[in-house]
Amino acid sequence: MVIKKGFFALSSCTLGLGLILTACGARGKFDQVDDGVIKLATSIQNKDSIAALNTIYKKYKERHPGSYPVQNFQVPGGYSGLRNDIRTRLSAKDGNNFYNIVLNYPDVVSSLATSDMQLILDNVDTKLLSKNFLSFNERIGGVRQKGIYAIPISLSTELMVLNGPVLHYILNSAKKKENGAQMIKRSGSFSTVQKGTMAIDMNDQKTKDLWQKIENAAKANGKTTSTQTSPQPKNAVSSLQLKQAAEGTSTDNSQDAENSDNEIKKTWGEYKEEGNHTLKGYTFKASVFENWNELLDFSTRVANSFPDKIKNQASKKATELQGVFGVDSVSGALFSATFAAGGGDYDKFFFNVKNGRGNFRNLLEKGSSYNNLQKVFNDYKQLISSNGLYINKGGAYSSNFLKFHQLAFSVGSSSGYHFAFAGESAKRLEFGQKAIEYPRDTYEIKAPTNSQNGNGTLLGSFTKSKSNGKEQSGQDEDNQTSETIELYKSSVPSGKEAGKNALAITNQQLISALENAAKDNKTSQPQARSLTASDQVQITQSSDKVIGYITTSNLDIDNNNTFDVGKLNGDKSTSKIIVNATLKTLNKINTLQSEEGIILPHPQKYKSTDPQAVATVQGPSIIGVHANAKENAETQKFINWFINQKETWPENSKGNKNGQNGQMTAAQYFAKSSGYVLPYSETFTKQSEDEHSTTKDAYKILKDVNDGKLVGYSDPSDFRSGKFRDTIVAAFSGAVSSKADFNKFFKGFEQQLGQEYRRG
């Protein structure tokens, strides 16, 4: 068996997508070298997903020892990075370093089809899958022969997370006081009376129920004992409370909500009704979260009602209030809102695929989707002008701020919505103008002592412990083994093994930062521990000087405070070092706990009067790539096993906690490990919400899509749709920064897109 050598860098042409494959020299089908390996390419960064894939590869090798083994190839840059990597390898006719399987969105099939490199999965049994979630194969551009080319294995949707305590402060500040109480605003030596004039429609049952949840969230956030007014641990119970519980009585916990409001006020500032388009005279209903038009209007009113911290603050530090509404996926929000405004009809959307061809003329020739996009944009424009919108840039998800009360609500993927909640004792690293929650799999870098650094090349070291893959909770620490990894300047000395017990630091700015931190007289004394379940930092004496932090979590690398330093042996992700950071431990009242968040579907209509509700359906599919006759057969053999064959899986893994799931297919194991929904027919016909405890909110929405109660939206698949999506996101992000109007936004979008999209 010949193993392919390392991947080589390929330069990409700078031409438009419609010409790249022809101009760069690649047009037409080509065979790959048969190297006896099935290469599966993915850009997934979720560690649970990666661990599940490795377990699946091992299981397949055990069960099919005579078959080609599967190897994982991790491509950086997310789905777009993998998509671009595939196009580049197609353009070079890379028969030595290409893939057999790709986990990505179906537009990759269209890209493969430009060189006839798509692999029809005609030997894969898809009977277990719901036909409703396979039908997108009919909307893939460039494919001549009808069939199954992409199989969805991990579905998610978009969810809205409301920060209950923050919403309570906003609404409680704005609403009319039932007992005639007034808000007193003190200015100088005199007081003026400021009345809240907003109403909460308590005659509407949905609104009444939502307000109750918001009140309960605020009470949980500011929970105190009966004799104390300062926030206490939220699991604390006083002797009086125990006595009242025994007697069947209860205590008035309205003070808890007031404590929460007082604390959140420090971040959000004073509520004010003067000015235009505030909450003055407004009637709040739960329906504001059901459609984009009302949601954006409400968000704008909130921003204008807190001018000192939002409307009048165009520039914000990472530790300050970021706005009212956070959006993780700009394309998802714009596309689903515009699709809903068009009645859930692809013929009225930006682009569609018919007879194997993608058509973008509806938007570019200013048809109905152009008008709908203008309506949606102008709703956003009001919020942008009031500095109330936060959008994800460079991996800085809104959940990073929602969990610290720096946003009121946000929309993001159901697969990651749990990141909106902080841990029991949340820690945050603050550096420069940025702040991040203390990442998982993070360790403290300690300065070397004089005796350690005899030759002057040792920069520092960190110690981590392994728990042999067992869950941390309930495990005997004696079973753990620790290892110390040292960081050296420029190169690793003899006697040390790079990647195993040493790392060479070559970035001069990072070297200087670590050396300067070691010289600093200030000694950092945070608690030394990792936040992951399987790895722990060995606790050291508090006198050890912390000069930085090293993590394998996904970080935005700026080469100023954050640096990529390569991969340690055994790690699936590269290590990153954070320097010049301050570690802060936050009181729970300053964080959003899971019981204080309110989970809702993303807005499913543009306006409440729209006849059709729409839900986003997203997630990667398993896609085959042509190689050669033998590898094509082996590829389909693996995919068929992955989809259909039930196996027994490790009981201590996330996908099979305590063995409770019994036998299941590799696809089921992967979905459960990753927090996705697998669209088998039985998922929606024989299973209940209780069987989807970690994905029940997404499950309910996807079940409604499967049952025809909602129209599912997913991008039509054309090889140009990836660039189209990236371009509209870039143009919108620019409009947020510059506060451009629609005409300027759209003109910039057209210029970046190019003429090739007008050709049909």
Swiss-Prot record:
Covalently lipidated residues, kind N-palmitoyl cysteine: C24
Principal localisation: membrane
Topology term for the membrane: Lipid-anchor
Signal sequence, renumbered to the chain: 1-23
Positions of S-diacylglycerol cysteine lipidation: C24
Keywords, alphabetical: Cell membrane, Lipoprotein, Membrane, Palmitate, Signal
Keyword Isomerase assigned: no
Pfam families per record: Lipoprotein_10 (PF03202), Lipoprotein_X (PF03305)
Subcellular localization, as worded in the UniProt entry: Cell membrane
Keyword Protein biosynthesis attributed: no
Polar residues: bias regions: 222-257, 448-472
GO annotation, cellular component aspect: plasma membrane
Residues covered by region (Disordered): 220-262, 443-482
Top-rank taxon, per record: Bacteria
NCBIfam families (UniProt xref): lipo_P68
Protein name per UniProt: Uncharacterized lipoprotein MPN_408
Phylogenetic lineage: Bacteria, Bacillati, Mycoplasmatota, Mycoplasmoidales, Mycoplasmoidaceae
